[in-house]
Amino acid sequence: IRDFNKENFELRKSRLEKMVKDLNLDHNETVAEISIKDQYYNMKEMIDPQYYIVELAREAMLSCNIGPVVVPVRGGTDGSRLSYMGLPCPNIFGGGHNFHGEYEYIPTKSMESACRVIVAIISKVYLNSSQNG
């Protein structure tokens, strides 16, 4: 279960628990069980306080002649998990197609562009750190 909104996320979990409870009541026995373990959360609340990292990525993309497209992600990524472990990791580049499918792929040009953006981010961070002491 994933959602952009924490309240809706909790509501979805509650609905599932109620469905299982109602199903068991309808059958007058335990025919279904549910166990919910949270794995991913919306990383927005971890990224927003450190939003300069998104701006840094946006500037790096522009310097590489790549038009940044900011699209919310509902979690389900390593970046979401890492963000909640204290390392804010917005998803800044995809480029892949047919994710999680038999025909998943990423074009070489997309990988090259991702590398250029990463180098641009590193350069900007290095320049800022050397200018600030």
Regions found by a protein language model. Give the residues of each.
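Metal-dependent amide/peptide-bond hydrolase catalytic core
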Residues: 1-133
